[in-house]
A protein has these predicted regions:
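Gly/Ala-rich beta-loop-alpha elbow adjacent to hydrolase catalytic centers
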Residues: 78-82, 86
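Flexible "cap/lid" loop of the alpha/beta hydrolase fold
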Residues: 91-92, 96-139, 178
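Conserved HGGG/HGGXW glycine-rich cap/lid loop of the alpha/beta-hydrolase fold
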Residues: 2-47
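Active-site loop/oxyanion-hole signature of alpha/beta-hydrolase fold enzymes
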Residues: 34, 40-75, 91-92, 116-120
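Conserved serine/cysteine hydrolase catalytic core
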Residues: 173-217, 222-237
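Conserved alpha/beta-hydrolase catalytic His-Asp/Glu region
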Residues: 138-188
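Post-His helix in hydrolase/transferase enzymes
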Residues: 234-248
């Protein structure tokens, strides 16, 4: 059967194409590894209303893409905002199909709370207020969720000029409703191993918040640190590719 497939789920304000630099490296290092990158609804070629979006709808969309690709054995990776989506995908697919869940600098609220609750102090109140207002006025969040100059500061520190251009060009509008919806991870199977990739120079999700999110998840079996910014798939594609390939190889089934 060989290697399990690798499913990559993007975070907020971006689409499936943000993984391209890392996928290019994976194709060189492990050409037999099947990789599926999914667009969440309202991104890329995937239709969807960002204003009325809900977590269950996004979970169903990812599961549908996995089913359409006929993937029965996989490792799933969620970046950033995918911390509210990927656990639901794992719950639906179960431990029989998911070998491991990897969360990279993800935002994981305490069960029963919302993504905005992961923000510190007054920022949480402001983010909730802004998201509610945007839902009421049927306005999606601006590309990347931030003005360009701030997005460059928050997402792109330490990048080369080419990496910054790629990142900012790929930013897109985000759903305000997802930000304030409460999560429910009550059915997530404990049998699926959990790995966390912690970004040490992250200005979007600080190390402190990441550790709080790990605790909210109930802990992880493996913690891998990378000295880079939030968009690690762009800033450190070689290192991330090596990590993801290594995790998949742990579950390789030798052909007779």
């Amino acid at each position: 059967m060989g290697l399990p497939a690798l499913v990559l789920v993007h975070g907020g304000g971006f689409a499936a194409d943000c993984w391209e630099p890392t996928i290019d490296v994976i194709r060189i290092l492990e050409p037999e590894l099947k990789v599926l990158t999914v667009d969440l609804p309202g991104r890329g070629n995937k239709g969807g209303d960002l204003i009325t979006a809900c977590i269950d709808g996004w979970v169903d969309s990812v599961v549908s893409d996995i089913e359409n690709a006929a993937l029965d054995d996989l490792v799933i990776v969620g970046h950033s905002l995918a911390g509210v989506t990927v656990p639901g995908v794992v719950t639906k697919l179960g431990s029989a199909r998911v070998r491991e869940m990897i969360l990279a600098t993800a935002q994981v609220p305490t069960n029963g709370s919302a993504l905005v609750d992961t923000f510190p102090g007054a920022l949480s109140w402001y983010a909730r207020r802004t998201a509610k207002r945007n839902v009421q006025k049927s306005r999606s969040l601006r590309p990347g969720g931030l003005p360009t100059a701030l997005a460059r500061f928050v997402f792109c520190n330490g990048m080369t000029p080419a990496q910054r251009r790629f990142t900012l060009a790929g930013s897109c509008q985000e759903s305000p409703s997802i930000m304030i919806e409460k999560v429910d991870r009550s059915g997530m199977p404990d049998e699926v191993p959990r790995t966390w990739i912690l970004t040490r120079r992250d200005r979007a999700v600080s190390m402190k918040i990441q550790r709080e999110c790990i605790a909210a998840l109930g802990g992880v079996q493996t913690l891998i640190e990378i000295d880079t910014c939030h968009m690690l798939m762009v800033s450190e594609p070689e290192r991330l590719a090596e990590i993801l390939i290594g995790r998949c190889r742990l579950y390789e089934q030798r052909r007779p």
